[in-house]
Regions:
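Tandem amphipathic alpha-helical repeat scaffolds
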Residues: 43-55, 80-94, 120-133, 157-173, ...
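Amphipathic alpha-helical segments of tetratricopeptide repeats
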Residues: 29-33, 63-70, 103-113, 143-150, ...
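Solenoidal tandem-repeat scaffolds enriched in leucines and small polar residues
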Residues: 149-229, 239
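Post-signal peptide N-terminal segment of secreted/secretory-pathway proteins
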Residues: 36-117
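Bacterial Sec-dependent N-terminal signal peptides
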Residues: 1-32, 39, 49, 84, ...
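Hydrophobic positions within repeat-based interaction scaffolds
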Residues: 20-43, 56-60, 96, 219, ...
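Residue signature of alpha-solenoid helical repeat architecture, marking inter-repeat boundaries
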Residues: 39, 76, 116, 156, ...
Length: 375
């Protein structure tokens, strides 16, 4: 599920997670009603937005933060308000809205100096280009972003630019170039820098090395991610619930490693560990990965009916909006039935998948040619 890789690693905890969000939000709203229109009020609005980041209230409060910050000529909170709008629309893949808020955010950041947030926002925009298969545009914009970050000596922007380059290269099947860009991002990480950025880069490395079947490096990065996560949660225990998706990711990819090294029982223990982090609020992509790893596990122990049933679950989830991933899952299901000895069923699935892939490949080839002509 290569397109899924592009989404699952981008926004790990860019806003702080909260447990008991309804209680925390209600409490802060009561405080907000008593505050004068000053910086304290802006700070409280900012905290409320962090809690409400996953629903439409985020936009309502971000609008309020923007209006009040502009009245007070507070460029810091105006920049943050623009960033929260961007994050909300990025998570919903609304490319035009992201572009609109990038334009609004940049002049505010030039005054506030919040360049880390601006480069995060640019990363959202460029990764959406990649997600919508505008690979040459993504590469061009990532290189512009890298140069701007180098010009102002912003490490986070440089790291993010290399991550964007990696996504675009991998999305267009240039795996070696993608891994090289990602390893450069990893090399540039400050030793005691932002843990969330470290987690994001490591998660990409884990996803890519797994796809490239590089078990040695995958295990190395899994162990490092586990250590970074452990230290982060020890230092920030209240944020553990907000990082549940990262724990799911880590356990699922440990399971992949152990399945790839013929250790299914250890793999199963990690799948079971991932289950305890699943909730109704778990991000869609992680739910797909969760069912997919169960399919892989049951295939490894030759329980083909159960393996196929889990693939069916992922197909239902992917069919509407993720055509190429849907085709990839059909191919996985075909391989399951080949192993099970049901060649007729496998052939039908192969034909369905290849028809989708041929259509997608032709469209992608035409799109890339047009992008190259324009560049």
């Amino acid at each position: 599920m290569k397109r899924l890789i592009l989404l699952i690693i981008t926004c790990y905890g860019l806003l702080s997670g909260y447990a008991n969000t309804d209680t925390a939000s209600d409490s802060l709203l009561q405080v907000l009603q008593t505050l004068p229109h000053d910086t304290t009020r802006l700070s409280t609005l900012n905290d409320i937005i962090k809690i409400e980041q996953n629903n439409y209230k985020c936009i309502q409060y971000s609008d309020s933060l923007m209006q009040e910050a502009l009245k007070l000529k507070n460029d810091k909170y105006a920049s943050l308000a623009a960033y929260y709008h961007l994050l909300y629309y990025y998570n919903r893949c609304e490319q035009d809205s992201v572009a609109k808020w990038i334009v609004k955010m940049e002049p505010l950041v030039q005054k506030s100096g919040l360049w880390d947030y601006f480069f995060d926002a640019r990363r959202f925009q460029i990764d959406l280009y990649t997600f919508t298969e505008q690979y040459e545009l993504a590469i061009s914009e990532a290189n512009k972003m890298k140069q701007k970050a180098l010009d102002i000596d912003n490490n986070r922007g440089t790291v993010a630019a290399y991550q964007c380059l990696s996504n675009a290269y991998i999305g267009s099947q240039r795996w070696d170039e993608g891994l090289k860009a990602l390893e450069e991002a990893y090399r540039l990480l400050p030793k005691n820098g932002n843990a969330v950025v470290h987690i994001s880069v490591l998660s990409q490395l884990i996803s890519v090395t797994k796809e490239m079947k590089d078990n040695y490096r995958q295990l190395k990065y899994l162990q490092e991610l586990e250590n970074v996560l452990r230290k982060f949660i020890i230092d920030n225990p209240s944020l553990k619930d907000g990082f549940a998706d990262v724990f799911i990711f880590n356990e699922i990819f440990y399971a992949h490693y152990y399945l790839n090294t013929n250790q299914p029982q250890i793999a199963y223990s990690h799948i079971e560990k991932s289950k305890k982090y699943l909730t109704e609020n778990t991000y869609f992509m992680y739910k797909v990965l969760y069912y997919d790893i169960y399919a892989k596990y049951y295939q490894s122990i030759k329980q083909y009916q159960q393996a196929s049933a889990y693939i069916d679950t992922t197909l239902t989830m992917l069919k509407k909006d993720f055509t190429s991933d849907y085709a990839e899952q059909l191919l996985k299901q075909a391989k399951i039935w080949v192993e099970a000895g049901d060649n007729n069923r496998a052939t039908t699935l192969y034909q369905q998948a290849l028809a989708i892939k041929d259509s997608a490949a032709m469209a992608l080839s035409n799109t890339q040619m047009e992008q190259i002509k324009k560049s």
